[in-house]
Regions:
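Conserved short-loop catalytic and cofactor-binding motifs
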Residues: 40, 63, 149
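Acidic, metal-coordinating catalytic cores used for nucleic-acid/nucleotide bond scission
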Residues: 44, 59, 63-74
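Metal-dependent phosphoesterase core characteristic of DEDDh/y 3'-5' exonuclease domains
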Residues: 20-35, 67-169, 174-178
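Conserved RNase H-like, two-metal-ion catalytic cores of nucleic-acid enzymes
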Residues: 1-58
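Active-site flanking residues adjacent to catalytic metal/cofactor-binding acidic residues
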Residues: 8-10, 65, 95
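Hydrophobic "anchor" residues on beta-strands that sit immediately upstream
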Residues: 5, 61, 92
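Active-site-proximal or metal-binding-adjacent scaffold patches in catalytic folds
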Residues: 181-183
């Protein structure tokens, strides 16, 4: 049976997990079905982390963009802050596409937008990750459009990461086959 793959992306109020919180997390199957989980208030973070942990249990492989350097350490830190077990994230087979691009391709730049341009993957032009902290402050003040903007940004990142994953699949077949054998 093929490994069940999920693309993961998170939205946060800071690049540092001791200074910020998780405000949203997106999951998308390799078939393209997406789901967005959000914290409408900072006090919702613990339940968001629990919900995300539970959702990830049904997948064999996590695929991220720069997840090894950001998403997973951020999630690990926030889980531990709330007394939750980080091991489900840490034990999951993980393919970081940013690492794959850096080690297997020879591109001028290796950030997601450039890789999407290289593979002619269309992206929505909207808020960027750096806009999330400001948007979240607006959302906390009741601005529903700001909350929706964060959601749309996350889902766009997921769609782009999924498309890059499909392009790079020949380069990660061995990791997928290994995960298949483990499931």
């Amino acid at each position: 049976m093929p490994a069940k793959v999920v693309i993961l992306d998170i939205e946060t109020t800071s690049l540092e997990a001791d200074a910020g919180v998780l405000v949203g997390a997106g999951l998308m199957s390799d078939a393209g079905r997406g789901e967005y989980l959000e914290a409408r208030r900072t006090s919702d973070e613990k339940s968001l982390l629990s919900k995300l942990s539970n959702r990830l249990e049904s997948y064999d492989v996590m695929v991220t963009w720069n997840g090894r350097g950001f998403d997973i350490p951020f999630l690990t830190t926030r889980l531990m802050k709330h007394g939750l077990d980080p091991r489900p994230f840490l034990r999951k087979s993980h393919i970081d596409l940013a690492d794959v691009v850096k080690s297997r391709l020879r591109l001028t730049f290796t950030y997601l937008d450039h890789v999407c341009d290289f593979f002619q993957i269309n992206r929505k032009k909207g808020p960027m990750g750096l806009d999330v902290p400001h948007l979240y402050v607006l959302a906390l003040e009741g601005d529903r459009k700001a909350l929706l903007s964060i959601r749309e940004h996350c889902l766009d990142d997921l769609r782009a990461t999924r498309q890059v994953f499909l392009k790079l699949k020949p380069l990660v077949e061995q990791q997928l086959e290994y995960a298949e054998g483990q499931s």
